[in-house]
Amino acid sequence: NNEHDNTLTDLYYDDVEMIKYQKERYVNALDKYIDLKKKFLGLDEIHMYDLYVPLVKEFDKKITFETAKKEALASVALLGQEYVEAYEKGLNSRWIDVYENEGKRSGAYSSGQRVHPFVLMNFANSLDTEFTLAHEMGHAMHSYMSTKYQAPLDRHYKIFVAEVASTCNEALLMDYLRKQSLDPKFQAYLINHFMEQFRTTLFRQCMFAEFEKIINEKTANNEVLTSDTLNQIYADLNKFYYGEDVIVDDEISMEWARIPHFYMNFYVYQYATGFSAAMALSQKLLHGTQADIEAYLSFLKSGCTKSPVELLRMAGVDMASPKPIEDAIELFDSLIDEFESIMK
């Protein structure tokens, strides 16, 4: 396990450096997205808070949980009978605490147990919470498959691979929904949702990872970290990542203080690596061969029997190379172009 953790430490440093080396491609893609936001929101200048305004308004149509279940299940049909039957059983056998309730915590979580996985979510009859269902069932099925095929000590997969299975299922649902309707407004809404995932999961989490790297190195060098120092580092990183096109208001410099993951050292970069791996694997599942599907299913069944990097390599993606992140940036770039052409 120490060997596994050392591999992840190396990968952490490699990924943060890789992002910096790719700053030009990376920032160009983000600049392009910010220009798109400015144009479609009709803004002369754009602040950090404007980035959260969707380019396409949320649909009025309410999605029932039954519809969400049906579509989420249909989107994973390509993963084969065993996966689909277990997934359907989970949807219909009370694995999920579905709706908001008084005193219930917000958000969504999955917990893998020997009896079967449990999912907590707050379904709100929206497309966003349909994607949440797909995401959490991705975690649940990863737990189910690992528990079924591995001994108790080998069934607990590492956080590094956890976000891959969940995000992969979101990508499969995205593909399924986009094929169901050619309505330009619906297509634009889905692409907007997808682009925001890239911004918040790939770009933003990499910025968080770099912030962590800087402050931990300062601590290792016996430098004192005051709130002013932390604010300055965080503000500089926002300027570095978002460029001159976005007005970085003073208030954003304190955002680091409200990110709970900073209290779980070196967690956030795994969202970015997991997202990149999931994009690569979902493309293989959708456009590859039966062998690609079998490799992915073997990965889901493997628990923690190999290091996370080896498991992902077995699934069909090499996270020790820059290619998955490069390909993810390329996909983001193509989504921006597609969105513009739809909205013309």
Regions from the PLM with identified roles:
Residues 1-118, 318:
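Contiguous, non-catalytic segments that form substrate-binding/exosite surfaces or channel walls
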Residues 1-4, 30-41, 138-148, 167-184:
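Long, well-ordered alpha-helical segments
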Residues 2-13, 41-50, 133, 141, ...:
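C-terminal, non-catalytic "cap/extension" segments appended to globular domains
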Residues 5-19, 50-61, 81-84, 114-127, ...:
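Glycine- and acidic
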Residues 19-30, 69, 195, 230-241, ...:
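Short amphipathic alpha-helical coiled-coil/interface segments
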Residues 74-85, 111, 139, 143-151, ...:
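Conserved helix-loop functional segments at active or binding sites
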Residues 124-146, 166, 171, 211, ...:
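Active-site recognition of the HExxH zinc-binding catalytic motif
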Residues 157-185, 194-196, 200, 274, ...:
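Post-HExxH zinc-binding segment in Zn-dependent metallohydrolases
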